[in-house]
Amino acid sequence: MNVLPCSINTLKGLYEISGVEVGQHFYWQIGGFQVHAQVLITSWVVMAILLGSATIVVRNPQTIPTDGQNFFEYVLEFIRDLSKTQIGEEYGPWVPFIGTMFLFIFVSNWSGALLPWKIIQLPHGELAAPTNDINTTVALALPTSVAYFYAGLTKKGLGYFGKYIQPTPILLPINILEDFTKPLSLSFRLFGNILADELVVVVLVSLVPSVVPIPVMFLGLFTSGIQALIFATLAAAYIGESMEGHH
């Protein structure tokens, strides 16, 4: 009977799953501050990829665009169209902000699946996509919230706060709560999806041969791109809403 060996193999697989490191962090002590080193390292890598690729492509623009130029122009047009659709005709000043958010999240999400972070050994925890950490997603959501209020105050002045009593003052607490829950929904949605995707891949790799999780990894790449698009779209929509009025 092969029941006993199968049971032993199953228990070994479950033991490996239980060893997946979630919530274990490696810190640097800089002055009087404790810094989350894992997020800083991976974020620096992502920023280096973005800045390096952009510098290489745009430092010597050609009259006849190269493939790299065409790609970056397509990305820029995509971000412009997204901003214009959600914000309206006054989208211009917000293109850099929306574009920065989209590109950083997109490359961060993909880095979790494409870059071999695990070959870098740390005393505690392990490297993963920057967006796999709640600190990163909150840090991305808070500037979005600030931009939301800034856009409304710039466009309408103090009259912007009149939206909180529309259509009736009874809704004042709900309208205030709505604005302060937007950054929470942005941060937790992104964090939850990226963390869940990486955990699913780790679990499947622990239980089944390495070939089987490949379709799941491709699905993860697709959903990672979708999450970046959702974040950028909602950020632009919130800014557009604050400039146009409460819906």
Curated annotation (Swiss-Prot):
Q: Could you tell me which Pfam families the record lists for this protein?
A: ATP-synt_A (PF00119)
Q: Main localization of the protein? A: plastid
Q: Looking at the record's lineage, which domain of life comes first?
A: Eukaryota
Localization annotation? Plastid, Chloroplast thylakoid membrane
The keyword Transmembrane helix belongs to this UniProt entry's keyword annotation = yes
Where is the chain membrane-spanning?
A: 38-58, 95-115, 134-154, 199-219, 220-240
The topology of this chain with respect to the membrane is: Multi-pass membrane protein
* Entry GO MF terms: proton-transporting ATP synthase activity, rotational mechanism
Keyword set, alphabetical order: ATP synthesis, CF(0), Chloroplast, Hydrogen ion transport, Ion transport, Membrane, Plastid, Thylakoid, Transmembrane, Transmembrane helix, Transport
Q: Which InterPro entries match?
A: ATP_syn_F0_a_bact/chloroplast (IPR045082), ATP_synth_F0_asu (IPR000568), ATP_synth_F0_asu_AS (IPR023011), F0_ATP_A_sf (IPR035908)
Give GO cellular component annotations, separated by semicolons.
chloroplast thylakoid membrane; plasma membrane; proton-transporting ATP synthase complex
Q: Which SUPFAM superfamilies match?
A: F1F0 ATP synthase subunit A
- The answer to keyword RNA-binding applying to this record is no
Q: How does it assemble?
A: F-type ATPases have 2 components, CF(1) - the catalytic core - and CF(0) - the membrane proton channel. CF(1) has five subunits: alpha(3), beta(3), gamma(1), delta(1), epsilon(1). CF(0) has four main subunits: a, b, b' and c.
Role this protein plays? Key component of the proton channel; it plays a direct role in the translocation of protons across the membrane.
Which HAMAP family does its entry note?
A: ATP_synth_a_bact
Family the UniProt entry places it in: Belongs to the ATPase A chain family.
Q: Quote the NCBIfam families the UniProt record gives.
A: ATP_synt_6_or_A
The entry's protein name is ATP synthase subunit a, chloroplastic
What organism is recorded for this protein? Answer: Nandina domestica
Name of the gene this protein is made from:
atpI
